[in-house]
Amino acid sequence: MRSVQEHQRVVAEMMRACRPITVPLTQAQGLVLGGDVVAPLSLPVFDNSAMDGYAVRAEDTSGATPQNPVMLPVAEDIPAGRADMLTLQPVTAHRIMTGAPVPTGATAIVPVEATDGGVDSVAIRQQATPGKHIRRSGEDVAAGTTVLHNGQIVTPAVLGLAAALGLAELPVLPRQRVLVISTGSELASPGTPLQPGQIYESNSIMLAAAVRDAGAAVVATATAGDDVAQFGAILDRYAVDADLIITSGGVSAGAYEVVKDAFGSADYRGGDHGVEFVKVAMQPGMPQGVGRVAGTPIVTLPGNPVSALVSFEVFIRPPLRMAMGLPDPYRPHRSAVLTASLTSPRGKRQFRRAILDHQAGTVISYGPPASHHLRWLASANGLLDIPEDVVEVAAGTQLQVWDLT
């Protein structure tokens, strides 16, 4: 029987790191930069006003007070976007708007609040300080400076900076494209009437959500009955567009195990096809599989919903995030005090649904350990990680908890 650590290693080694691509800014949010970005121009691009007010020579406002304002004629209006470069003559003012280019010769901006707001002439009621309220070209970014770095997450602020620099695209590591397939002839689509012997299919919805939560993209979700031809048709249709295939169900030791049957058939054996089916010393999630379909990595998970989602967390989420260069590939591990005793099967690393109290530093096992009890997992915020050599855990014991929040 394979250990959890060994199976984690096998899955991680199979996953391929993404190669950088260039995408429009509108598609880059949340991705990781695949290279450094050098500023093609300075920011601000030109000296501009930080206030609505009047561009002046500071010396022309000497001694101005509310009681004794300095009167200056207004020679020009400069709105934001005006293209021609003006020159301010001595003992005059230009009315100027926020973001408008500062005229040559002006050394300060007097805010409109410190004036009478005149149009033809203006009463300056405050002595100007040289350089005040002028945004100098390059004070934020100098042209040629590396402003964004390889491995940096593309946040809204990063997109804003890129756009301000005139960049329409960014180099990024793309999202991994994942195909999710559920198997079982007993599965019915949610919202349709259940026939005798059927249950509603939940794994594809759940696993697709987990894929997106990990930062990847879902190529398609599909459901195959216990029919090798139907399962193979889904692979043939979608696998070419996927970087990873995840299946659930059909990997145990009984009859009608469609995933095992498919990869035992001549169509999916040899060449760049092949899946290794193993038992992993864990609960839930003992039956596992890993391999390739036409060169595309595939991870086959058990069909019970809790087993499928726990297996995703343990084996798929970390290398999936690593392949995309995303930070924090592993769920945070917390040390917490167990509030009630429990038992665990000998020889298996057990992951139990848990409620973690972050403030108190305590944890309690939540619900029965059976792999079909999805309700308890939906309400849990952690996974208790119990080593395979531990059989009994007393209340008060410190345990590791995977924080799912």
From Swiss-Prot:
It is an enzyme of class 2 (transferase). The keyword Transferase applies. It catalyses: adenylyl-molybdopterin + molybdate = Mo-molybdopterin + AMP + H(+). The keyword Nucleotide-binding does not apply. NCBIfam families: Glp_gephyrin, molyb_syn. Catalyzes the insertion of molybdate into adenylated molybdopterin with the concomitant release of AMP. Was identified as a high-confidence drug target. This is Molybdopterin molybdenumtransferase 2. It comes from Mycobacterium tuberculosis (strain ATCC 25618 / H37Rv). The gene is moaE2.
